[in-house]
Amino acid sequence: MQNSESGSDSPASVALCSSAAAQAPVAQPVTASPQRVLVQAAGSAPKGAQMQPLSLPRVQQVTQQVQPAQHVYPAQLQYVEGGDAVFTNGALRTAYAYNPEPQMYAPSSAASYFEAPGGAQVTVAGSSPPAVPSHSMVGITMDVGGSPIVSSAGAYLIHGGMDGTRHTLAHTSRSSPATLEMAIENLQKSEGITSHKSGLLNSHLQWLLDNYETAEGVSLPRSSLYNHYLRHCQEHKLDPVNAASFGKLIRSVFMGLRTRRLGTRGNSKYHYYGIRLKPDSPLNRLQEDTQYMAMRQQPVHQKPRYRPAQKTDSLGESGSHSSLHSTPEQAMAAQSQHHQQYIDVSHVFPEFPAPDLGSVLLQESITLHDVKALQLAYRRHCEATLDVVMNLQFHYIEKLWLSFWNSKSSSDGPTSLPASDEEPEGAVLPKDKLVSLCKCDPVLRWMRTCDHILYQALVEILIPDVLRPVPSTLTQAIRNFAKSLEGWLTNAMSDFPQQVIQTKVGVVSAFAQTLRRYTSLNHLAQAARAVLQNTSQINQMLSDLNRVDFANVQEQASWVCQCEEGVVQRLEQDFKLTLQQQSSLDQWASWLDNVVTQVLKQHAGSPSFPKAARQFLLKWSFYSSMVIRDLTLRSAASFGSFHLIRLLYDEYMFYLVEHRVAEATGETPIAVMGEFNDLASLSLTLLDKGGCVWALPPVHSGGGGSP
C-alpha cells in the first residue's frame, strides 16, 4: 500500500518508511502461514515534520501463545497478510487494506493486540506508545460490502462501510469478554485509573452483567445503580470508582443507554432508560431508601375503578370528576406509582361468606332482598377500598367511607356509586336502610368478618415481606395512613349507633396497629441488617455473650418461667453457633421460625395452643431481658448491638406467633389481634368462642415446658 494521498492500494502488503528520504527497518518481518495478524502502527505526525529513524534498542521482540478464542481488542491497527514485512513511518497517515475475507477493525485508544489460530507463534514488533489519532477504530467484524455482521460473541453490530469515520455500535443482551476489557482500557486511558485497579474493574463489570439487563420501556435512577455499586464494593471490601467513571463503565457494558429526567415537578431525577434489575438478582431484596423514585418494571393501573359519587350541590362540581384529579392529587398519584414495585399488586381478594341469619327475625322494614343488596354493596365498597390502597392513593379512603356511610335517605330519592364497567349501578343503600341493617346482630357480625378479610388483604398488599427493605417514604406514608384511619371512620359513621361504631372502629384499630407494628419491624430489620453484616461487631458480640453467666440467668428465670433447663441450654448453644457463623438476617429469621415450630409442636391441634403461644412470648421476653441486664452490668462493648438485635427478635417472634395462632384457630391475624379491641362491644360473642386469645394471664403461671 502506498501513502494515502496517492490513492493506490496494494492487495496484501503494507510497507511503511520512517521518512521520505530513507527507510530504516525497526523490526524483523512478521512471518506466518495463512493467518491474520493485527499489528499496531505508529501514530501519525504532522505533515512536513522531520522524522528520525527509530533506534533499534527501543524495539522489543515479544512471542506470545494466542488463545483459541477470538477476541476483539481496541487499538490503532494495520492489517497484514502472509509474510510481508512491516515498517513504521510516522509521516504517513494510517491506511488500511482489506480483501473479501472477513477482517477486524476497531476504534479507541488502547494497546497493541493480535489474533491468530490457537497454537501459532507470532512475533510482534513494538515500540514506544505512539500518539493515537482521534479517528481511531474499534474492533468490529465486517465484510467488504459493508453489510452488518454480528460477531461470534453476539456482542456488537456495525452499520456502513469502513471509511475512516466513527461507527455506531448497537449492544445486544450480552457482552463479550472483549467488551469488558475494552471498557477497562478506556477507563485507564481517560480516567487515569492505575493498572492495579483494572483487575477489580473486571469484577465490577461482571457484577453489572450479573444483576442488570437491558429492557424496553423501563428505567432506573442513576443514583440507584451507583448506590448498589457502592454497597457491592463495601460488602467485598473493594475500592469504588467515582460516579462519573461508573457512568462510563455502565455505558461501556450496556451500550445505547439513554438518560431521561423523570419524576414529579420539583422532585425529578436522572434515570437510565432501557435497563432494569434482573428478576433473580439479590439486589431486589436490597433496595435502599434513596431508591424510591425507581420506575415500576411492570405496568400497573393507577386509576381506581371506583370513585366516590360527586355532590351536585354547586354548578362547578356538577357532572364532573375533575376535583378527584386536581393537580396535587395527580402529583400524589404519580409519586405513588414509583412505590408499586414494593407492594403485592397481584394479590387476589378472597370471597366473603354469606351472613348467617339463622332464626333471627328481621325488622318489619328489613327484608331478605335488603340483606342481599347489602352484601352486593358492601362487597363493592370493599373492592373499591382494595383498589385505592393497591394504587397507594390513601387519600381516597376517607371519601369512599363518607360516600358509603352517608348516602341519601330513601326519602331523598335513589343514590348510587359510579360502578365499574362490569357491574350495574345501584350499589349504595339508602342511609336509613343501612342503619337498620347494622342494628341486626348477625349482619353486624358478618360485616365484622368481612372487615377482617379486607384488612388482612390490605396488610398483605402493603407489606408482603416484613423483612424486605422498603423506602422510608413508603413506610412513612403507610404510618400516616394508619394514624388517620380511626378518625376517618368515626367521622364517616357519626350518625350510626354507638355499638356499630365500636365494632367497626375495633377492627380498623387492629388494622392500624398491625400496620404500625409491621412498619416498625421492617425498620428494625434494616437497622439490624447492617449490624449482622459487620464482622467486627459480630465478633465483639460473641465475645461479650461468652462472658454472660447463663447459669445465674437460668436460676433467676426458672422460678418465674418454669422452663426445662435442657431446652434453655439448647437455645443458648444454637444462638451462639448461629452468631458465630455470621448468619444473614434471612438465616436468623429461619432460625427463629424453627424455634417457634419446635416449642409449639407439642401443642399443635390442642385447645391450649393459643395459651402456650402466649406463654412462650412472655418467657422469651423475660429470658432476653435477663441476658440484656447481665450485659449492661458488665458494660459490654456490644450492648447497643445486642439491644437492637433483641428488639428485632422480640418483634419478629411476636409476628411469627401471631400467625401461628391465626393458623391454629382458623382466623386471620387481624381477627386474632382484633379480639381484644372488640371485647367491650362483643364480649358475649367472644365468650361463646372460648374466650379472648390474647388476654394475658399472670406471668408466674407455668405450662408448656417451653422457654
Curated annotation (Swiss-Prot):
In-chain residues carrying the UniProt-annotated modification Phosphoserine: 33, 420
Report the main location listed first in the record.
nucleus
Q: Where in the cell is it found?
A: Nucleus; Cytoplasm
Matching entries from PROSITE patterns are given as:
RFX_DBD
Q: Which GO terms describe its cellular component?
A: cytoplasm; nucleus
What PANTHER family does its record include? DNA-BINDING PROTEIN RFX2, RFX TRANSCRIPTION FACTOR FAMILY
Q: List the protein's name.
A: DNA-binding protein RFX2
Organism annotation: Bos taurus
